[in-house]
Amino acid sequence: MLKWALVFFVISLIAGFFGFTGVASGAAAIAKILFYIAVALFLLFLVLGVFAVKSIK
């Protein structure tokens, strides 16, 4: 349990560093792009999965 507390402490220090240095705006833009890519892939695989189940039956 202490290990996880230290891991999250280090993550919070890194996030604080990025938040106070102005790098966060660039990282947020990249995160938005990655989010939309992940949503598109999720929907694609969801549709493919539905059609795969229908073709098996």
From Swiss-Prot:
Where, by residue number, does the polypeptide cross the bilayer? 4-24, 33-53
Name the UniProt key words of this record, in alphabetical order.
Cell membrane, Membrane, Transmembrane, Transmembrane helix
Q: Which GO terms describe its cellular component?
A: plasma membrane
Q: Where in the cell is it found?
A: Cell membrane
Q: Specify the protein's topology with respect to the membrane.
A: Multi-pass membrane protein
Q: Does the keyword Transmembrane apply?
A: yes
Q: Which InterPro entries match?
A: DUF1328
Q: Which residues form a coiled coil?
A: none
> Which Pfam families does UniProt cross-reference here?
DUF1328
Which family does the similarity line name? Belongs to the UPF0391 family.
HAMAP family with a match to the protein in the record = UPF0391
Q: What is this protein called?
A: UPF0391 membrane protein Tbd_2239
